[in-house]
């Protein structure tokens, strides 16, 4: 079986790379999408969620924030602000981030950036969900 090369990139560089991907399943703004070797060239907006990476002897989940994908016949590039494999998620740290975001949202302080706090809460909840998939 032909396989796909997957590269997940953040502003800090490449955080996940694999050459033997049989299929990657991800959530785009248009819905769930599966990418396999030979996929037609595609660019799509990605929403906060997870990427399920299927390979010969198993699968992995990676928590990702909003971003974009570019699929070519033999390569999938995912460009996001943050990405973290489920196996590397620090659940306690994610719980602290969730608590911090919730307290910012409850705060009546005019200096609180509500949209930023909502995004932080969404990322923390996503990391906690993906950690459970591991």
UniProtKB/Swiss-Prot annotation:
PANTHER family, A to Z: ATP SYNTHASE DELTA/EPSILON CHAIN, ATP SYNTHASE EPSILON CHAIN, CHLOROPLASTIC
Biased composition (Basic and acidic residues): 94-104
Keywords: ATP synthesis, Cell membrane, CF(1), Hydrogen ion transport, Ion transport, Membrane, Transport
Compartments where located: Cell membrane
The protein, known as: ATP synthase epsilon chain
A GO term from the CC aspect: proton-transporting ATP synthase complex
Function recorded in the entry: Produces ATP from ADP in the presence of a proton gradient across the membrane.
């Amino acid at each position: 079986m032909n396989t796909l090369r997957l590269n997940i990139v953040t502003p800090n560089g490449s955080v996940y790379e694999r050459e033997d991907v049989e299929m990657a399943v991800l959530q785009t703004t248009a819905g769930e999408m599966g990418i396999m070797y030979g996929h037609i060239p595609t660019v799509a907006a990605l929403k906060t969620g997870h990427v399920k990476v299927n390979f010969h002897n198993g699968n992995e989940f990676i928590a990702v924030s909003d971003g974009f994908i570019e699929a070519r016949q033999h390569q999938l590039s995912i460009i996001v602000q943050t990405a973290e494999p489920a196996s590397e998620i620090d659940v306690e740290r994610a719980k602290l981030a969730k608590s911090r975001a919730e307290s910012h949202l409850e705060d009546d302080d005019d200096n609180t950036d509500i949209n930023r706090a909502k995004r932080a809460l969404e990322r923390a909840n996503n990391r906690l969900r993906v950690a459970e998939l591991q």
